[in-house]
């Protein structure tokens, strides 16, 4: 059983800075994002990971590399939410046409619905729980929030109540054999 699962959200991109939904578009890190990625490496110094899994998108892979991590494998299940018709739009832009829209409840036309994302997260959780030692997952804001919810056996929409900044570290673990969120958004 994985002793801890460290979640690393990729560092800043132009779209994340602007609040745009960035799903499958492969946006590079900003210069500031690269600096944050390097500083993540300082925070991870001395940590030993039995497995490091990354989203295949360059912003996640570059963040991992800058942080001194070597991706053991790329997982499509760690890709960001597929925003379909809403790719590149901000939430206010979407709500101008669809008042009250909430990603975690409503999903996205032409993209993923919450049960689709939950299924991806459940596959990742099953994989990492089988690993002996510490695991690192380097991916994206919404998928990591959803993954944290599924780790504690909560509905995927709980992720909509968790804020996760770019270039942050969160830790999933166990307390008395119960899955917990040990640290969040640090």
Task: Give the label of every model feature segment.
Residues 1-3, 47, 82-92, 149-186:
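Acidic, low-complexity terminal tails and accessory targeting/binding regions
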Residues 5, 131-142:
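Generic beta-sheet signal
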Residues 45-48, 128-133:
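Glycine-rich phosphate-binding loop signature in dinucleotide/nucleotide-binding domains
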């Amino acid at each position: 059983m994985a002793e801890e699962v460290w979640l690393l959200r990729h560092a800043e991109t132009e779209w994340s800075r602007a609040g745009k939904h960035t799903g499958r578009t492969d946006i590079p890190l900003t210069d500031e994002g690269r600096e944050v990625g390097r500083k993540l490496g300082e925070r991870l110094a001395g940590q030993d990971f039995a497995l490091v899994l990354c989203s295949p998108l360059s912003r996640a892979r570059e963040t991992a590399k800058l942080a001194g991590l070597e991706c053991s494998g790329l997982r499509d299940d760690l890709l960001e939410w597929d925003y379909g018709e809403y790719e590149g739009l901000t939430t206010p832009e979407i709500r101008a046409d669809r008042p009250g829209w909430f990603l975690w409840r409503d999903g996205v036309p032409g993209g993923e619905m919450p049960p689709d994302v939950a299924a991806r997260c459940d596959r990742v959780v099953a994989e990492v729980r089988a690993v002996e030692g510490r695991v690192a997952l380097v991916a994206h804001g919404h998928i990591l929030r959803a993954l944290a919810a599924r780790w504690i056996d909560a509905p995927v929409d709980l992720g909509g109540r968790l804020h996760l900044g770019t270039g942050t570290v969160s830790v999933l673990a166990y307390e008395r054999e119960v899955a917990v969120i040990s640290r969040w958004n640090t």
